[in-house]
Amino acid sequence: MNWQSEWLRVEPIMGSRRISNFCWACITSLGALGFFLVGIPSYLGKDLIPVLPSQQIVFVPQGIVMCFYGIAGLFPSFYLWCTILWNVGSGYNIFDKREGIICLFRWGFPGENRRICIRFSMKDIQAIRVEVREAISPRRVLHMKVKGQQDVPLTRISENLTLREMEEKAAELARFLHVSMEGP
């Protein structure tokens, strides 16, 4: 949902709070917990969960491996839950004609550089470029060409926009910034 006036344009950017990340975090958490809850009862010699009988699992070597997989699986699930909690990668793009400034703001991981804000002068913007690579998983990214620097991506690779939507977004932004548009 973009907001635009005559002098200002704001584009919110979605971060880690996506349905796919929630699904992967749940799957890895449940899988890791399942391995761990099967490995521990094999050490204790008792069934902690009646649905998961562990009497047939010998602690050495199967129980140890199950516990190890359970503990190892908790690390990526913890990482996913933290990125969802902190909403890493979210932010906004501000295009301010009155000030002549473009600000790209993103939230990062907690610490000294949690807030990431990159500023450009509108005078340095040369063009808006659409990168399209059609394959099994197509890649469509909107870039901003900045004088004397690398191209700056404005959309995420995981943003699934159709080619038409991407071109419309690029044309709208190029019109607002009064720059040319390069594309496929």
Swiss-Prot record:
Coiled coil: none annotated. Keywords: Chloroplast, Membrane, Photosynthesis, Plastid, Thylakoid, Transmembrane, Transmembrane helix. The chain crosses the membrane at residues 22-42, 64-84. It is a multi-pass membrane protein. It comes from the Eukaryota. InterPro entries: PSI_Ycf4_assembly. GO terms for biological process: photosynthesis. It is found in: Plastid, Chloroplast thylakoid membrane. Pfam families: Ycf4. The keyword Plastid applies. One of its GO terms (cellular component) is photosystem I. HAMAP family: Ycf4. NCBIfam families: PRK02542.1. PANTHER family: PHOTOSYSTEM I ASSEMBLY PROTEIN YCF4 (PTHR33288:SF4), PTHR33288. Seems to be required for the assembly of the photosystem I complex. Belongs to the Ycf4 family. This is Photosystem I assembly protein Ycf4. It comes from Huperzia lucidula (Shining clubmoss).
